[in-house]
């Protein structure tokens, strides 16, 4: 949502971020405690088939505008309602809908609670939420309580309490709450998942994930766009602010929540130097960007231990000058795949010595491309969205709902992956001492069916 009450929202958002950070540090004793279930598990939830999926969009700004295009290009999906309090993006949405020759949906734009009118509509089946982080939890919860399935941008929530609340609400209402981790639908990530399922790397031992993406330029976005609200987090939380893009695929490789789960985490941050230096260089001394105390370390490194003993390194750096990377590394007893750039080394079934990287991916694409990408990859690339992963994610969401199949990601995945943010902040504040992950599945991970290779 591009502009929720503009400056007023930005101040309120900063306050909520500070409260979330303080709550996270104050409530670390007993983070692994499992509350009583509010309803039955939604692991593998299947809902009645929908001939048509009626879509309500909350937030059609920098991120959400893409969903207007994607759902207009997916058979069986129809946008029936749109909410955003920024009149400029509402006008843009109206034009896009007209350009597609579609009937105009209902629009809601008056006040911060306008989304409640959208989720109450009878002609909305799913609510897709692409708003600033602090709004993900209340909007997803409201959608489920109104009988809708919630699809929310990353992260799913910002505190352990929020994450448990969304798990409980999903179980109580028997509604889907999917955090839309689009990177799980990238060609490379899907291929590696297929390789892992076919046993190419042997028994899995270790993974590496990251969000390394220089975004200092967003500090110049003051009244609208992502930087207008995202910059403030660097002055409120010292930890991994944005863990899920790299972590989601690695978690799927390892069958997290479906045979294994995150056990505990230890985290450390480097000094926080880059944001302040950038502000001093790019803005006047009395500018608002020079009034912030940037505390989030330029590089955060967290180590996750799983119940089965595997390890995952997760890094976050949106400040230093370096090439983009999500790492996307998975190491097994027979070899390793690493991304950025893609390369592979195998002891058996490789094409050379495992002492040297094989970087010829065309061979491996030809042999291990995921069936879903083989089927939909060309259409996904034509429709765009981070190389097609965004479109493929949306297509798969609609496909599952129309065909009565469980979603590829569920509320337990969103909770576990998002929990890295508050747990890393608490660990950093405590000299890197470990923090336990809650078992959001309440033990169901031990018997849940692993994510399959769908076509």
Swiss-Prot record:
Family named by the database record: Belongs to the Gfo/Idh/MocA family. Glycosyl hydrolase 109 subfamily.
Cofactor-binding details, from the entry: Binds 1 NAD(+) per subunit. The NAD(+) cannot dissociate.
Protein name: Glycosyl hydrolase family 109 protein
Species whose genome carries this gene: Shewanella amazonensis (strain ATCC BAA-1098 / SB2B)
Cofactor: NAD(+)
UniProt signal peptide: 1-33
Residues at which NAD(+) binds: 62-63, 84, 112, 133-136, 153-154, 182, 242
Keywords associated with the record: Glycosidase, Hydrolase, NAD, Signal
Class of enzymatic activity (EC top level): hydrolase
EC number: 3.2.1.-
PTM summary: Predicted to be exported by the Tat system. The position of the signal peptide cleavage has not been experimentally proven.
Residue positions binding substrate: 211, 230, 242-245, 324
Gene Ontology MF term list: hydrolase activity, acting on glycosyl bonds; nucleotide binding
Main function: Glycosidase.
PANTHER family: BCDNA.GH03377, GLYCOSYL HYDROLASE FAMILY 109 PROTEIN
Highest taxon in the source lineage: Bacteria
């Amino acid at each position: 949502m591009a502009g929720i009450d503009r400056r007023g929202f930005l101040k309120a958002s900063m306050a909520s971020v500070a409260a979330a950070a303080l709550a996270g540090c104050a409530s670390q004793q007993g983070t692994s405690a499992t509350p009583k279930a509010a309803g039955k598990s939604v692991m593998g939830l299947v809902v009645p088939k929908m001939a048509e999926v009626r879509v309500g969009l909350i937030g059609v700004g920098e991120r959400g505008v893409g969903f207007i295009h994607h759902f207009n290009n997916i058979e069986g999906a129809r946008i029936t309602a749109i909410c955003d309090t920024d009149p400029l993006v509402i006008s843009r949405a109206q034009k896009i809908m007209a350009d597609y020759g579609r009937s105009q949906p209902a629009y809601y734009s008056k006040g911060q609670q306008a989304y409640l009118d959208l989720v109450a509509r009878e002609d909305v089946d799913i609510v897709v939420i692409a708003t600033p982080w602090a709004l993900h939890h209340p909007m997803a919860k409201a959608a489920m309580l109104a009988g809708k399935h919630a699809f929310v941008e990353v992260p799913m929530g910002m505190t352990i309490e929020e994450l448990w609340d969304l798990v409980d609400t999903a179980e109580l209402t028997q509604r889907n709450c999917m955090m839309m981790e689009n990177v799980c639908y990238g060609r490379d990530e899907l291929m590696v998942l297929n390789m892992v399922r076919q046993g190419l790397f042997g028994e899995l031992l270790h993974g590496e994930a990251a969000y390394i993406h220089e975004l200092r330029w967003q500090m110049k976005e003051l009244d609208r766009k992502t930087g207008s609200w995202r910059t403030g987090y660097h002055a409120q939380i010292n930890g991994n602010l944005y863990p899920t893009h790299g972590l989601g695929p690695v978690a799927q490789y390892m069958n997290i929540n479906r045979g294994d789960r995150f056990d505990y985490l230890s985290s450390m941050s480097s000094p926080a130097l880059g944001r302040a230096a950038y502000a001093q260089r790019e803005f006047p001394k009395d500018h608002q960007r020079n009034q912030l105390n940037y505390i989030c370390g330029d590089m955060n490194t967290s180590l996750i231990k799983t119940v089965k003993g595997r390890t995952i390194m997760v890094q976050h750096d949106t400040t230093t000058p370096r090439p983009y990377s999500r790492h996307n590394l998975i190491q097994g007893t027979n070899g390793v795949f690493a991304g950025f750039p893609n390369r592979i080394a195998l002891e058996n079934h490789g094409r050379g010595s495992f002492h040297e990287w094989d970087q010829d991916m065309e061979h491996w694409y030809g042999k291990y491309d995921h069936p879903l990408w083989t089927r939909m990859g060309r259409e996904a690339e034509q429709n765009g969205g981070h190389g097609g992963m965004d479109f493929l994610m949306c297509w798969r969401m609609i496909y599952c709902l129309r065909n009565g199949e469980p979603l590829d990601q569920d509320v337990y995945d969103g909770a576990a992956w998002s929990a890295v943010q508050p747990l890393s902040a608490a660990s950093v504040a405590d000299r890197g001492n470990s923090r336990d992950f809650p078992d959001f599945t309440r033990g169901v991970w031990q018997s849940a069916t692993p994510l399959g290779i769908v076509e």
